[in-house]
Amino acid sequence: MSEFLPFSRPAMGVEELAAVKEVLESGWITTGPKNQALEQAFCQLTGNQHAIAVSSATAGMHITLMALEIGKGDEVITPSLTWVSTLNMISLLGATPVMVDVDRDTLMVTPEAIESAITPRTKAIIPVHYAGAPADIDAIRAIGERYGIAVIEDAAHAVGTYYKGRHIGAKGTAIFSFHAIKNITCAEGGLIVTDNENLARQLRMLKFHGLGVDAYDRQTWGRAPQAEVLTPGYKYNLTDINAAIALTQLVKLEHLNTRRREIAQQYQQALAALPFQPLSLPAWPHVHAWHLFIIRVDEQRCGISRDALMEALKERGIGTGLHFRAAHTQKYYRERFPTLSLPNTEWNSERICSLPLFPDMTTADADRVITALQQLAGQ
């Protein structure tokens, strides 16, 4: 049997090893100069004025919601077809997640669904740039501006994604992920971009105990050695070890995403003759980062269920993923919102399957996946 082909594998090389070695030898391994360099590099990528590195995108979502003073009695609009951390952070702050449906074929939350869910209690909108493609963010921001509601972009899948010529996050507030399967990774990490100076200042406080400065600030700039707590905060800072890896990966971003695009094109060409349905691309001008390549496996159309397909691929030494099981169908949220019905989300949640997609995949690896799909489709 061939070696197991995982759904994802981080693309690490000698450059990342050298970056870690440099930090270890520097004597400063926690938050410091590599964090600052990463934040500056991200501002150059997205065009934002501020970037705040954090220990995870979940941490970034938590403190962004906190900085916007979202809490008990507030509502936050978000798709159900997303990673549960967003719903969890909303709920942990005492607010109510208002889950809305997505477009059946792009899996993007639509401006129409968002606007129809707005109430006097709506405090924020969290659209998801799904699988590496952009949501229609201009239209969504216009809704936010019209109603005076904050828009927080979930850009966990969108490092290297462009919308109408602008990198995701530009002129707004967005949260990126550097988790192990993401387009660039440092194992665990995240980053928030914003043009709102007051928000950026609050985020920096909240990510580090509510202090106005961190240890590197105090040592480097000669600030007061005993910083004051300005507001209760968290320990969500990113170490320089992680930041150095992320910074090295960011330099490689164009190469990494180009390889992802090549594999995606290989899949697209092969799937044209198969019953498995890939996602449709958004109609607006964009550059896809191809974080995920997703097919829909409809048993009536394909002759096999999604779960059976995933198991059959596993038996052939091929890993897959599920992004995502709809949040409102999971125990806690199902019991909290028992009457919620989101037909497009539910249809897709039962059928979506993420195929292997990572930069170190070879053409032969992709061919192996395609051959297995052809066999399982009876071709």
UniProtKB/Swiss-Prot annotation:
Record-listed N6-(pyridoxal phosphate)lysine modification sites: 182
CDD domains reported for this sequence: AHBA_syn (cd00616)
GO biological process, one term: response to antibiotic
Cofactors, names only: pyridoxal 5'-phosphate
Keywords: Aminotransferase, Antibiotic resistance, Lipid A biosynthesis, Lipid biosynthesis, Lipid metabolism, Lipopolysaccharide biosynthesis, Pyridoxal phosphate, Transferase
Catalytic activity: UDP-4-amino-4-deoxy-beta-L-arabinose + 2-oxoglutarate = UDP-beta-L-threo-pentopyranos-4-ulose + L-glutamate
Top-rank taxon, per record: Bacteria
Keyword Lipid metabolism: yes
Keyword check for Aminoacyl-tRNA synthetase: no
GO MF annotations, alphabetized: pyridoxal phosphate binding; UDP-4-amino-4-deoxy-L-arabinose aminotransferase
Enzyme class: transferase
Pathway(s) per entry: Nucleotide-sugar biosynthesis; UDP-4-deoxy-4-formamido-beta-L-arabinose biosynthesis; UDP-4-deoxy-4-formamido-beta-L-arabinose from UDP-alpha-D-glucuronate: step 2/3; Bacterial outer membrane biogenesis; lipopolysaccharide biosynthesis
GO cellular component, one term: membrane
EC number: 2.6.1.87
Pfam families referenced in this protein's UniProt entry, alphabetically: DegT_DnrJ_EryC1
Quaternary structure, from the entry: Homodimer.
Protein family membership: Belongs to the DegT/DnrJ/EryC1 family. ArnB subfamily.
Function: Catalyzes the conversion of UDP-4-keto-arabinose (UDP-Ara4O) to UDP-4-amino-4-deoxy-L-arabinose (UDP-L-Ara4N). The modified arabinose is attached to lipid A and is required for resistance to polymyxin and cationic antimicrobial peptides.
HAMAP family to which the protein is assigned, alphabetical: ArnB_transfer (MF_01167)
Protein name per UniProt: UDP-4-amino-4-deoxy-L-arabinose--oxoglutarate aminotransferase
Organism whose genome encodes this protein: Shigella flexneri
